[in-house]
Amino acid sequence: MERKHLEAYKEAKSFKGFEVWWHSVQMTLKMYITTFLIVFFLHLFLTFIFIFLFRFDDLKLVFLAFTTFSPHLWIKAVFYLVKISILFFILCSPVWLAFPIFLKKYKVKAEKITRDEHLRGAKVVSEDELKQIIEKDLKEKKGLLTIGKIPVPPMAETRHFFIIGRSGTGKTRLIYSFISQLRERRAKVIVYDFKGDFISCFYDPSVDLIFNPLDRRTIHWCVLREIETFADVDSISMSLIPSSTRDDKFWVDAARDVFSSILFYLKYTKQETNHHLWHYCSLSEEDMLNQMIIAVNQGVEIAKRALGYLLGYEKGSKVASDVLSTMRQYTNCFFYTSHLKNEFSLKQWLEEGEGFLFIVGFPRLRDTLRPLLSLFIDVAIKHTLSLSEAPERRIFFILDEFSTLQKLSAVLFALEQGRSKGLSLVLALQDFNQLERIYHESAFSILNNCSTIISFALNDPKSQEVMSRVFGEAEILETDETLAMGVEDTRDGLSLVRRRRLEKVILPAEFAYLKDLQA
């Protein structure tokens, strides 16, 4: 019953519309009449003031005439008084220009008190406003990266970029723009081109390099060339075989130990080729056990760690098989590099090279090549972090379809510490779930360490919610209008109440309705 009563109360009755209209008419008439009277009395007041100031002596004579007993002087005095009053009334008539000014003031005041007022927190501004804000603090405007019309301050380049949006919304177009601008700057750039979109447009064989073992133009790179110290061995193992969940931590650590033993043994015995690397990574359990025994006998102490996992093989233990199976998930990629020579040094190119280095994916072998391409990028990032301090240096890593790479051990450290090395990361992906699936709780740290965040349209509710939180909240002072109605006109009234409200700058659902190329 209460619900029916409430619905009946909310029904659109005609008298409600009448009350709103009639109240509006009354308030409008009241405004015009009151304003008219204010201006009219102001007109009269100014007229008397001007007469008093400029015809004071004449007023004395007029009043003296009224003190006599000559009626004909009274008539002349009244006529003269009316004459100068009309004259000054006309001269003061411009005061009526205040009438529309008053109306304009009312309008401005109404807009001010009814408009939500931003108190603090995040704020949405137009593209032109943001451009003006940024350019105000820029000393040099030439050669800057731009996002649409918006310039990117030089110091923001090394604070990294995070680009997110569903397929086909404009991420690739934005990266095209970045690469084109960086080409004009002759910057040093490493581009992860999973789909091959960028190499077809920007590859210049005179200055650029390609890494893709299935491309005849590829550089001849061997990971063994990047090893200079014992610490490099473990670092490369971590790059190739990423950390995983606690449930399989043992198998990951064991696989890393075996791979580290292989690397160290190859380096120790001067077998620094991709052919030898693939040969030892593909050994059977029995052959791997025998090889580790040989390595230990030759003084390779690190091989003892691998030997501990393999010794049980002869007794029927499955540990050796499981460890090698885990390792081969990541080392099978070396089959595709076994024909490559050991000619290219990533570290040397980062220190002395120029141009672009394209790391090109091959979708048909996505899962097989993922560890190799991830290893290459992770090693490149670590080498960049080992360079001397040089904030003015710029080395860009543009990683499109970032989620197609496996977990990079150095990416979070690069985001936090890369600024002093001149390192700039551009990470692009389709939704936040992809990032969280790979990096787990570190996904939010990656996002938080990117100062320039660009979001295109998103369909995934989790991604929408995360991006809404990233763009922040604002404290708003809003005005609520309340219209009271009654049978008697005296009961009608409009009240305005101002109160503070906390709201999200961008609602999660708004991301779903962004148009293509709109961010």
Please describe what each predicted stretch is.
Residues 143-148, 340-341, 437:
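Short gly/ser/thr-rich secondary-structure transition/capping motifs
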Residues 1-190, 199-206, 268-269, 294-298, ...:
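Accessory regions of macromolecular translocation/handling assemblies
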Residues 2-4, 36, 154-157, 161-423, ...:
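P-loop NTPase motor domains
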Residues 148, 187, 212, 270, ...:
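Glycine-centered flexibility motif
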Residues 115-121, 125-127, 164, 192, ...:
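Generic beta-strand/beta-sheet core signal
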Residues 227-231, 415-519:
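Conserved ATP-driven motor cores of ASCE-family P-loop NTPases powering translocation/secretion/packaging/pilus
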